[in-house]
Amino acid sequence: MSDEQLSAGPAQPPDRFALREADWRNGALVYQVIVDRFAQSPRLAAKGYLYPAPKRLRDWSETPEKGRYLDDQEVWSHEIDFWGGDLPSLRSRLEYIDELGADVLYLCPIHLAWTNHGYDALDYQQVRPDYGSRDDVRRLAEDVHARGMKLVLDGVFNHMGRHSPAFQAAAAGQRSRYRGWFDFDQGYPGGARAWANAVNLPELVIENPAVQDHIWAGDDSVVRSWLRDGIDGWRLDVAFE
């Protein structure tokens, strides 16, 4: 080691280290919420019509139980059992979440979907009507930010739901604009490549520029439009794929 090296003093970390320390994602305490199960909605009776059969709206005091596989729906019955929580009822509990010391409120999927878990998206741009509306999301974001927290949504962009208009149109004909969004092959269960071979969750062909444009690349993409509504970031489902 030279005299110059000895007298140079301690090494200065690159600016990127300082930026990382200032990043709100670094070391944040994250509170995860399944909106349907978190806080009982006071308007439950008024929105019962949003759970048409074979969906079931359960009593808030009931304990979830494993159901049976529904061949006609290609899901388990417990996947379409609902407890009726929504975005307004979640907003009413923000003080509780704040007092726990949470830095980030992370919501499991809130977009339009067939099941209670929401990982089978029907439309990424719409909020499930039993949860509320995009205006409700904007109000939630404002209230979250007023408490010094961040709001993160679940980005389920590896696959969509089999009941989605995009998949149904793609499956109906090879000339559909959505045909290239999915990988069709009779060698797959259900005729299309699906996450974990779950036929209700056909995988998107992320390499397709049209899919990229719809999800994140386009000016009106899913990712950009929700960020404009006030959310702070995304948790990416199945990111390793």
Range-by-range predicted roles:
Residues 2-3, 102, 142, 236:
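Intrinsic disorder/low-complexity signal
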Residues 232:
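Receiver (REC) domain switch/active-site residues of two-component response regulators
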Residues 106, 152, 235-237:
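Conserved beta-strand positions in the central sheet of alpha/beta enzyme cores
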Residues 16, 22-28, 34-103, 110-229:
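Substrate-binding/active-site clefts of carbohydrate-active enzymes
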Residues 239-241:
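Aromatic- and carboxylate-enriched substrate-binding clefts and catalytic-loop regions
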Residues 1-14:
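Extended acidic/polar, glycine-enriched regions
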